[in-house]
Amino acid sequence: MGEKIEISTINKRKLLVLDLDETLIHTAYSPLSSGCLIAQQGYFYLYERPYLKEFLDRCSTEYDFAIWSASKADYVRWIIRSTVLSEFAFVFVNTRKNCKRVFAKDGRVEYIKNLSPYITQYEKVIMLDDVPKMVIPIGCCIKAPEFRGGADDFLLNVSC
């Protein structure tokens, strides 16, 4: 996980970098009253955002995919194995160790996802994330509404 690549090495296709938590999936410590439970591991209940497979199928005609999550590697591997993400190839999978750790004004730890070292052509890269302020450069991020496990049609309507 976390190999550096140049976008120009990806068959001249565009790159769609995907965040996981609250963008494509939601995990909860107890079962939710709505939503489609995909998997359970220990105290984690995993919910996949509706229309994820349709979105990825639609985007795969023009984009290569990568994952960048501020979560730990074992958790990210579990998410990929447990969801439709396992059916797709990824140019890279970055986790918390690839993020820059910063402290917010209130003392909370936040993790910045800096795409700059990974790309040479910014116009060919888009990131989908629910917290675009944590992505550098900011201009390449599409904000996804926070997903909390229930009914949702964002991925059905967002264009690639």
Describe the predicted segments one by one.
Residues 11, 18, 41-52, 65-69, ...:
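Amphipathic alpha-helical protein-protein interaction segments
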Residues 1-20, 29-34:
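Non-catalytic pre-domain segments flanking phosphatase-related domains
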Residues 74-160:
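C-terminal cap/substrate-recognition subdomain and adjoining C-terminal extension
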Residues 12-25, 55, 61-64, 89, ...:
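Core residues of folded domains in eukaryotic genome-function proteins
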Residues 6-9, 37-46, 60-65, 144:
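Short interface patches used for recognition in eukaryotic signaling and trafficking proteins
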Residues 2-5, 9-12, 49-54, 110-115, ...:
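Eukaryotic intrinsically disordered and solvent-exposed regulatory patches
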Residues 25-49:
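Metal-dependent phosphoesterase signature
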Residues 52-80, 96:
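Substrate-recognition element of Asp-dependent hydrolases with the DxDx(T/V) motif
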